[in-house]
Amino acid sequence: MRGSIVLLPVVGLFGASAAWAADVDLTELKASSPVPYYSAPSWSVVGSVAPTFTDNALFSRDNRKSDFYYEPDVSVRLDGNLTNDLSYRLYARAQYEAFAREKDGNAAVARVGARLTENWDGWRFSAIYENRYDFDGVYRDLAFTSHDVMGSVARDFRMNNVTLSPLLLVTYRFSDLAEARRWRFDALLGIEVKLDPKWSIVSTPLFEAFWFTDGLNRGRQDQIYSADLGVKYNFTSNVSLTTSVVYEARASNVAVRRYRDLRIGPRLDFAF
């Protein structure tokens, strides 16, 4: 999530930033997997907990401050099928980041959404709607409300012990805050190399591009580049621990929005 978190309090010279980019993180990538056919809809709870060190808590170009933060992320989902190839998902998701020292970096998101996915010859085509609430602080002050309309295409390629999972996503954000309205393009590649039934090497290189369309941010263009490497251990089929190192950089035609960030930490993923 932190991949594109924006400093929500900053609605000054250039308005609000891009908002939690890594909504398309490894968890979301897995969430794009095909829904098995069920005769009746099924409920699930999916989430993660991640204590993390960052060397740039406030996404600053010039005033870098290191800190530790805690990030829980929980979703409740209802999955079902309309046909053998057409599945749907209704979900509610809450996540936040709480810093040990740099409290200005605290932020939270709550959202509800729906996704419709067509499976065609191994490819997954999805249409997604999300009603999103971004908060300054840990659910302290509502910063803005958004309606995200998304389309994605994804597929898994398996070769022996290697799984490659490319995903492309296009989003337009409607928002009550003019500076938050924008187009967004995501391209990522999930990589998993199984060493044995329990251990894997994982990585999710990511590229994101933002084109802001309104308010003081009109004309602003950002690009985020992210690379990571991690080791994953599966306790069971639905509980795993991944420890990873992530490097991220943002380029922008607004110089003050450029930054670099290094993050290190474990993440516990679960699904029930």
Stretches with model-predicted labels:
Residues 41, 66-72, 104-110, 143-149, ...:
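Residues that define the transmembrane beta-barrel architecture of outer-membrane proteins
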Residues 20-44:
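Outer-membrane beta-barrel biogenesis signature
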Residues 34, 75-79, 113-119, 130, ...:
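Transmembrane beta-barrel domains of outer membrane proteins
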Residues 51-75, 100:
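Surface-exposed strand-loop-strand hairpins of Gram-negative outer-membrane beta-barrel proteins
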Residues 40, 81-85, 117-123, 154-160, ...:
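Outer-membrane beta-barrel channels and translocator barrels
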Residues 232-234, 240, 259-272:
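Outer-membrane beta-barrel "beta-signal"
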Residues 43-49, 88-92, 110, 123-127, ...:
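Transmembrane beta-strands of outer-membrane beta-barrel proteins
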